[in-house]
């Protein structure tokens, strides 16, 4: 499969020159002459990615990334022409650093004349690793199963931090600076755990290859392999080439995740170790699965309660590693623009969720992993209040004089004696109470009993939100393909309600439920004043949550003869919200860097070795107050950035 990927990297692309010519139509002045504020507002992706790269790699790297985001793929020569103050050597040096951190992908193309040109693309995966770097370390430390908590967690943090800082590393290089044999054994076992949990994977050419170009090469290869004299129609040829390309594409994509390519057995100790020469890198998709689980747990907590959400947390963690990817690579190939392909992709995703081994579970599976401090006893109602009313009603009915029964010949059947009737009733009540007591005792014996866990799973499966699906009695799986759109909708409504008010959320729901509505229908269903409805609609339209559609009633297209209807287009709304949150995150990073620049002299003085720890003695009172203000504002930025990040990532997930 490496040979196949190698062919893709060195494949001849006859359209390379025409693509370059079309890109030359956009001059550097079109981007660089825009004022700073306008440029940041027009392209939130550019604003965020430049600020992130600037904070980690400096101004030159930010300029290169900015050009790649704004103009698309570029060669070294084109980058030199478009960026002032950078020559060929500086551009190449910067590209090496960006490529090492997986912020840039590249592809070599051969023109008709035989000239080879390497084009560079920005890679959002590497930039997102920089964005999540601290959270990645924290998440992995939380999920790792270690014996000595403090020492081993510190070692894990150092390993992950080194991998993020260098982009990739081998175990052999990492252990070269370790002298103790026991420490080498410990670190080697931690590397094995990280690989088994999926947080570290083998780095390959795939991480530096544009997905769109890889798919295009595979598709064209299989299409050309079909004989020209084949009796198949062109439509069937394309369909067959597409199926074969999908198979090869899946093999290439999944190869870095295969443990057999990473782990081996040490002949000396007979223990599993990571191959010393294999380069390892961070698996961002594995980390994002954990972030997705957290979002779903928070959603379950608001819908079905905290105890049931804890049971749901165990179910998600149990199946998290084998769960579907956050964003399937096929969605980045442009293949899903075809409606039939999109529908078949959705159906296939639902089938994979149900049939993949390791994604289904039952109550017994969860009972083995429930924490000891979680007690499920008393978390469910053992008897409905209506049962008491029914029982008291039946007793009252029994106390009333019963209707006399007669035989065919007119003989009246006498009622039972009062003593006998009373004894039968008491025995029946005693039997019911004994049965109830037995049920309650069964629940109170084991805090993690299968019956209690199964009851919580049924609550999740019967909720209006599809947290779980039941394939067969007692066996469940998480329907991510159905649940993620619900999560997006819920978070979007939360943001709208918290920023524009509950009335905006009510109108948004009303329009979305009715698809296409007029103002008259909104007035009759929203139960709000007409003045409030119009002002709220104006706010929703400004935030791209609601769109206006003109429907002419006659051939005359004047506005006075048209009807204006309202509708919600979720794709546009979510994209606008994502860009809005993205811009706010970038603006926070921009303000943080600006704050550091304004106080650079004070920060340099405070970070000197002879001043650290003696600030109260060596700094003036005004400098101490200024330093305290800078630190507080920086902490405030990180807190706000964390909240924005948790909202933004929901709209990033497919």
From Swiss-Prot:
GO BP terms: termination of RNA polymerase III transcription; transcription by RNA polymerase III; transcription initiation at RNA polymerase III promoter; tRNA transcription by RNA polymerase III
Keyword Cytoplasm attached: yes
UniProt-listed InterPro entries: POLR3C_WHD, RNA_pol_III_RPC82-rel_HTH, RNA_pol_III_Rpc82_C, RPC3, WH-like_DNA-bd_sf
Phosphothreonine: residues carrying this PTM: 27
Disulphide bridges, residue numbers: none
PANTHER family (alphabetical): DNA-DIRECTED RNA POLYMERASE III SUBUNIT RPC3, RNA POLYMERASE III DNA DIRECTED -RELATED
Subunit architecture: Component of the RNA polymerase III (Pol III) complex consisting of 17 subunits.
Protein name, as recorded: DNA-directed RNA polymerase III subunit RPC3
Record organism: Saccharomyces cerevisiae (strain ATCC 204508 / S288c)
The encoding gene: RPC82
